[in-house]
Regions:
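Bacterial Sec-dependent N-terminal signal peptides
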Residues: 1-22
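Carbohydrate-interacting regions of secretory-pathway proteins
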Residues: 19-212
Length: 212
């Protein structure tokens, strides 16, 4: 019995220590451990995603990597999210929020935040894709930058490094055109986009700060 109680005590200390280590200052929590896909789930074309030097690399046919870990049971409504991102020339990718796992195709639920500094699509990094688009190029290829998303109620703020590039308020009872019906504030998880075989984009230090 004493040995069992000792085991429970040690186990409790380990779990508490891990939880404290996982939580960063001011409520930030890591979603990616830098070495494995634990807590993530990919739909089609799993080989599009790999891990190199502590970063997720998106390079290959269309694919999406969804967070399905334990933080908030991968269901976020109000939050701050940030990731360090590096694009290579001619690359396109995206970060989804309020989405849900799909086996294939482009996510139908939630919003996409664009990652694109030089690819042919004119919508540049920081765009709330096809909703509030950014034409300016704020960062260069082959340079790490931080892309941040904050959702509070119906308000979305997107930042590139410390610069706000999008402030968007979703109208009440918003109606989207055909094919975009799912682009609405709700709740859900995050996803990383693998856009095409010519695109190679890196993601690391993926963090979330739940606000509810």
């Amino acid at each position: 019995m004493k040995n069992f109680l000792l085991f429970l005590s040690i186990f409790s200390i380990i779990i508490t220590s891990q939880a404290q280590e996982k939580a960063n200052n001011d409520g930030w929590v890591s979603l990616f451990d830098g070495k494995s896909f634990d807590g993530w789930k990919v739909g089609e074309n799993a080989s599009t995603f790999s891990i190199q030097d502590g970063a997720i690399v998106a390079n290959g046919p269309v694919a999406h990597l969804f967070y399905n870990g334990d933080v908030k049971n991968h269901d976020f409504k109000n939050f701050e999210f940030k990731a360090d991102v590096m694009t290579t020339p001619g690359s396109n990718s995206g970060l989804y929020f309020h989405t849900v796992f799909q086996d294939s195709s482009w996510p139908q639920k939630g919003y996409e935040v664009q990652v694109n500094n030089s690819q042919e699509d004119w919508r540049r990094t920081g765009s709330l894709y096809a909703i509030e688009d950014v034409k300016e190029v704020y960062v260069k290829d082959n340079v790490w930058y931080t892309e941040s998303i904050k959702v509070q109620g119906k308000h979305v703020t997107i930042k590139i490094n410390d610069k706000i590039v999008v402030e968007y308020d979703e109208p009440e009872n918003v109606q989207r055109p055909a094919g975009m019906e799912g682009r609405k504030i709700s709740s859900g998880t995050f996803a990383i986009q693998g856009h095409d075989p010519k695109s190679k984009v890196y993601f690391k230090n993926i963090m979330v700060k739940p606000l509810d």
